[in-house]
Regions:
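C-terminal helical "tail/cap" subdomain of flavin- and related membrane-associated enzymes
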Residues: 393-603
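Glycine-rich FAD pyrophosphate-binding loop
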Residues: 69-94
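Predominantly flavin-linked oxidoreductase catalytic cores and closely associated redox partners
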Residues: 87, 171-328, 386
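Beta1/beta-strand and adjacent pyrophosphate-binding region of the FAD-binding site
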Residues: 43-60, 78
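Flexible, low-complexity inter-domain linkers and amphipathic docking helices that mediate domain-domain
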Residues: 1-37
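Conserved FAD-binding subdomain of flavin-dependent enzymes
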Residues: 67, 88, 92, 97-120, ...
């Protein structure tokens, strides 16, 4: 205990404050959200006509409405939501975990940092536990996550969706947004000649029509009003399934092991505030603590290895956990009476032929597309999509022609952002059983995010048409790197599929080229020219990272690896040699297989 107190005392003041908030929240010192927050938006009387109607009042729709009113204070904005507000806490929705872009959008762009710090949980990064034998010995599993940087300088949050959306609905009303709940969109007529669109609404058995210049579809994956009406849905080749529940129980993964070395890697109690991923071949299981005291527990799996039918109800879900993640299975089984809800979702990934139209409609959130929950990208897509929509509407209402902008934004959101993201996940679930390959892949995936779209969004350039067009060749280069590296990881896994790794941990915040040079510079305040130069430098850095990863796997692959840019092997290794810092720092990612370690010990 004295050692822990010393370590807490040595933390910077800001980190101690965050720790104090977490402790206060866990001990019940915080007053209830019902007593502290307004949770019912003001009543709104429907008008005959609006500038913008947003169909859907969930996370995407509410944040978009606030964003639009800030950008266009005179605009008449209506949000139509089919369900009743206030929503229950621990609302049964995906999107409880945010990462840098989404968190920055919520806390800084929209200005809700106070709510996120006081009413939600500050997240301690992403944390991964790779498989070892029957997965009962957590301390033996390879662990990837932050250890010493307990309070990361660029914040992210674990978000209780019900609590957050209740606050957003009230905030939208205060911004002048019209909000109606328990109201269904029963029809939509899209104008083709510049006249207003017509939205048909049904509320309490009464029907009403409203006209609008713009219509934004935030109605979600299942309803997807415009995507279904215009037959825009594209079936994704990424066919994974998910099931999850909320349980009124704070789950601390650290309590799954009493190993002193495992416990001593970081301050006691901090692991539970990470988004925790328990992984094995073909699946991962999430644990997400929520500020309301609940924990979200989910299974995401490739049906070729783990069919949805094996975990698609509570009993099967628990049985599946007993077999694959026994610590979680035991805990759920002992507390079945605390389960709050359960849902299973088949083939959650989906795509669209079009996101934005010169005909004054747009898709946002899950009504547009969704990739995969692994790295918590849902709020990122909301942030980027809302920003693009706000710029489109602002430009159009000012009289601008949207043809060029709509064409580029569709390419950016659909063909660049979605395509590069889906490749991270598609056909990659089997390699989650390979600790060596997945740790390298996770570093690559996170580095790619920090090096590309992260700094673009943080520097408020995502909707800057001139700037984004100027860096399109860089983006295409990033996209090509992504495609070929994901192919490489798959080949590497197939070549080393039988290896077992254990007794290792990696802290990505301790890799100098990655953390300070990429992550911390996402928000460096660059002007357009400096940011363009930084992105070009980041391409070069990622090439070197990819080259060194090829070098590390070279002996395992059945054929000579080619570099992402198509260089010969000799040119490839020469490129890697120019970044000796990358080589030295990535060396800590290479693990010794258990069989080799045992042989060395025997000798």
């Amino acid at each position: 205990m004295k050692d822990i107190n010393k370590r807490i005392a040595s933390l910077p003041e800001e980190k101690r404050k965050v720790l104090a908030r977490l402790i206060a929240r866990d001990t019940g010192a915080r007053e209830s959200v019902a007593a502290a927050d307004e949770i019912r938006p003001p009543e709104h009387t429907l008008a005959d006509e609006y500038d913008i109607v947003i169909m859907g009042g969930g996370l995407a729709g509410l944040t978009c409405s606030i964003h639009l009113r800030r950008a266009l204070p005179q605009a008449r904005v209506l949000v139509v939501n089919s369900t009743k507000y206030p929503a229950p806490e621990a609302a049964h929705k995906v999107g409880e975990s945010s990462v840098e872009i989404g968190a920055h959008y919520y806390d800084t762009v929209l200005g809700f940092k106070g709510h996120l710090e006081d009413r939600q949980l500050r997240k301690m990064g992403l944390r991964f536990f790779l498989p070892y034998r029957d997965n009962r010995d957590l301390a033996k599993r390879v662990e990837l996550g932050p250890f010493e940087n307990h309070i990361l300088p660029i914040p992210s949050y674990q978000i209780d969706r019900g609590r957050f959306e209740n606050m957003l609905a009230v905030a939208a009303g205060k911004e002048g947004v019209g909000f109606v709940d328990e109201c269904k969109v029963s029809g939509l007529t899209l104008s083709q000649n510049g006249e207003p669109h017509v939205v048909e609404l049904t509320r309490a058995g009464e029907q009403r029509q409203v006209k609008t210049r713009w219509v934004v579809d935030a109605s979600g994956r299942a309803t997807a009003i415009i995507r279904r009406k215009l037959d825009l849905t594209v079936e994704s080749e990424h066919k994974t399934n998910a099931a999850w529940l909320r349980i009124k129980l704070p789950i601390d993964v650290e309590k799954f092991s009493d190993d002193p070395e495992f416990r001593g890697r970081m301050l006691t109690g901090f692991r539970q505030y990470s988004t925790t991923h328990l992984m094995d071949r073909g699946y991962w299981t999430w644990l997400i603590r929520l500020a309301s005291g609940s924990t979200s527990v989910g299974i995401v799996a490739d049906p070729r290895l783990h069919p949805l039918e094996t975990f698609n109800n509570v009993d099967r879900f628990n049985d599946w956990l007993d077999q694959h993640e026994p610590h979680v299975g035991d805990l759920i089984r002992a507390n079945r009476h605390l389960i709050q809800d359960f849902i299973a979702l088949k083939r959650y990934a989906h795509h669209t032929k079009q996101v934005y139209s010169t005909n004054r409609w747009a898709l946002i959130g899950d009504a547009a597309l969704f990739t995969d929950p692994l790295y918590s990208p849902g709020s990122d897509f909301i942030a980027m999509g809302n920003t693009l929509v706000a710029e489109l509407i602002t430009q159009e209402l000012a009289g601008a022609d949207l043809t060029d902008r709509v064409e580029f934004y569709n390419w950016l959101y659909r063909d660049f952002l979605y395509d590069t993201a889906i490749r991270i996940f598609q056909d990659q679930y089997p390699l989650m059983g390979n600790a060596q390959v997945f740790v390298a892949k996770a570093l690559w995936d996170i580095a790619w995010y920090w090096a590309t779209i992260g700094p673009i969004f943080f520097h408020e350039r995502i909707a800057d048409l001139e700037f984004m067009k100027s860096i399109k060749p860089i983006l295409i280069h990033f996209q090509d790197l992504q495609r070929k590296m994901q192919d490489f990881f798959r080949a590497w896994d197939e070549a080393t599929i039988d290896e077992v790794y254990c007794d290792a941990y990696v802290d990505l915040t301790k890799i100098p080229f990655l953390y300070p040079l990429v992550h911390l510079e996402m928000d460096a305040g660059y002007n357009a020219d400096q940011l363009r130069e930084k992105l070009a430098d980041n391409v070069s850095l990622l090439e070197a990272v990819g080259a060194e990863m090829y070098r590390g796997a070279y002996g395992a692959l059945p054929t000579e690896p080619m570099t992402s840019s198509g260089l010969t092997v000799s040119e490839h290794l020469e490129r890697a040699a120019k970044r000796a810092d990358v080589r030295g720092q990535l060396h800590r990612l290479w693990f010794v297989p258990e069989r080799e370690a045992a042989m060395a010990e025997a000798v």
